[in-house]
Amino acid sequence: MEIFDTHAHLNWREEYKDDIDEVLENAKNAGVTHIMLASSTIEDSAISLEVRKAKSGSGVKFSCMVGVHPEDATNFNDEAKWQLEQWLKHKDELGIVAVGEIGMDYHYDDASPAYEAMAFIYQMGLAYRYDLPAVIHERDACEDTLFILKSLYEQKVLREVPGVLHCFSGSVETAKILLDMGFYLGFDGPITFKNARKAPDVIRMCPLDRLLVETDSPYMAPVPHRGHRNEPAYVKYVVEEMARLKEISPEEMARITTENAQRLFGKDT
């Protein structure tokens, strides 16, 4: 079984500084062949690029996204824009295959909705200009996120395959709108929780060729590791639960979601 974890924050040194090599060995033993390093800030993005280079011989393949999370939108200034452009101009040699994670988040008040929207729209423009998918974060901001994405879609400034809504927690109705615009949906540990309500119905509805698996490590570890630090090896539990919901084998789900990730992020990833 070969699994592609499409969202992991292994660049957070405080979380993995003592055992990153063990974490990667665990991932390899669990069947994880590829990890997408998620980024939230300019500093975070730089560390992702460093980790990819430093751990290239680990037996697990890495790809990177670069971008500024909505919680850091107040720091999305001219310097941040310049740095993203510099990286994106050299995306192939740096292993950058997406812009992210970007989006809207009203759960905390780190940045105003106006700042978040500005950073989101600008970075969606970068994704379009550099022909890369966007990795989109949405929390407690579904209406405004959909408004922005629909506006970009109607203006024809979204790629044909525009990206993925990572850690998707929306309704079936919202999922259908996103699927109609060409998006993929990413799922992680919460689908294994007993109180999972929306996700099972969304997964059952979603076409197999639009599903992705992720961990969002170090957050949201799946059952049976809920409450502990998450790591890419645990993505197998997400695969198993998605397979159960779609009534196929875990091996088939791993194969399909890996092929989906490679189709979205590039066949060479």
Q: Which residues does each PLM region occupy?
A:
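Mid-domain alpha/beta scaffold segments of enzyme catalytic cores
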Residues: 1-269
